[in-house]
């Protein structure tokens, strides 16, 4: 295990072991190799002391070089900095409980169900994108800033347990949205949102537009 230092602060622990890897992209992987590499990241820091994942610029969207396949654990926060690029998390056994913060103009893509572990919050800064990529994820609070967006493809499912706030146009796609708890406040219309929405008994959704939840059915 090695300490991960960031600006002089111990923000995470990294575990290494032998593992099977591939190279290239998801569509054009070049076979399997046995390598000694990163297998686990334990998040420690929160807020300004959170671990920041940076994207390598200029690579294809599905490049494995911008994918974190190691298991992510711990109670710290995770920040994604990928201006104009995409970072993905692809380990379905992730269990981290801290917040997930996608910084301005960055995209975070799920490569597996539950890739965000048991994150207590997903916070999308201006023009940031969370791409569920046909996967399912449960989160605590959801915050979607101006011009940011949660992109839910056909078989995607997002469960929000603790409400939150969504700006106009912040929801897109035709998967499933489950509001399980808290109050989700949606400001403005989401004309590109065609998902089925389920509002559980302990939850509420507040909208100020007839298209706040798009144009599909709403169940309660």
Enumerate the predicted regions with their spans:
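Extracellular/surface-exposed low-complexity segments
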Residues: 1-69, 153, 157-162, 174-183
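Surface-exposed loop/turn positions within long extracellular repeat scaffolds
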Residues: 40, 44-45, 65-75, 86-158, ...
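FAD-dependent flavoprotein oxygenase/oxidase catalytic domain
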Residues: 76-77, 82
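Small/flexible residues
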Residues: 5-8, 12, 21, 81, ...
